[in-house]
Curated annotation (Swiss-Prot):
Binds 1 Fe(2+) ion per subunit. This is Alpha-ketoglutarate-dependent dioxygenase AlkB. GO terms for molecular function: broad specificity oxidative DNA demethylase activity; dioxygenase activity; ferrous iron binding; oxidative RNA demethylase activity. Changing residue 69 to A: Abolishes activity towards single-stranded DNA containing 1-methyladenine. The lineage of its organism: Bacteria, Pseudomonadati, Pseudomonadota, Gammaproteobacteria, Enterobacterales. The gene is alkB.
Length: 216
């Protein structure tokens, strides 16, 4: 697939109060990020988690950092232990941490201290239903979301599930940061369309950085 914007400089696209898309912000770091994704997955493999209601998610997931997001019969939680390996989640790669902090600073959140990174792998047809990120103890900390590989349609709404949605194309290297007034806005990913990307072949990766523990 020919990238007509391969030489373009990153630019910012306002999304909502406290939210911005940093177009192509992760483009130059992508190859190292993908190598590090593979390294994390070699220690804590991708898996399709089951929701408390018994639904198997279409997105394959793993984590790195001090805490990892996972599902349980009683709900959703952050845990320092991977329930599949019974070992701590892999450490967050330096490339992840550096990119996340640069993106957060560019978006106006210079004090963000990520301690959890959820890695999602989307195959064609996989999606993420509308949801809020509300399992974190300090909702003043933003969310940083990095797109790699195949393009996807990102849905971004409001504080209510039935609020009007913005639908935006996220491409390889784009980073979305939201916090402040939009921290609890509903968001999701529409079913991924089949395609080819030279770095990820037939899939899309998403890195979601959060501050899941107490700030030091």
């Amino acid at each position: 697939m020919l990238d007509l914007f391969a030489d373009a400089e990153p630019w910012q696209e306002p999304l909502a109060a406290g939210a911005v898309i940093l177009r192509r912000f992760a483009f130059n770091a992508a190859e190292q990020l993908i190598r590090d994704i593979n390294d994390v997955a070699s220690q804590s493999p991708f898996r399709q988690m089951v929701t408390p209601g018994g639904y198997t998610m279409s997105v394959a997931m793993t984590n790195c950092g001090h805490l990892g997001w996972t599902t349980h019969r009683q709900g959703y939680l952050y845990s320092p232990i991977d329930p599949q390996t019974n070992k701590p989640w892999p450490a967050m790669p330096q490339s992840f941490h550096n990119l996340c902090q640069r993106a957060a600073t560019a978006a106006g959140y210079p004090d963000f201290q990520p301690d959890a990174c959820l890695i999602n792998r989307y195959a064609p047809g996989a999606k993420l239903s509308l949801h809020q990120d509300k399992d974190e103890p300090d909702l003043r900390a933003p969310i940083v979301s990095v797109s790699l590989g195949l393009p996807a349609i990102f849905q971004f709404g409001g504080l209510k599930r039935n609020d009007p949605l913005k639908r935006l194309l996220l491409e390889h290297g784009d980073v979305v940061v939201w916090g402040g007034e939009s921290r609890l806005f509903y968001h999701g990913i529409q079913p991924l369309k089949a395609g080819f990307h030279p770095l990820t072949i037939d899939c899309r990766y998403n890195l979601t950085f959060r501050q899941a523990g107490k700030k030091e």
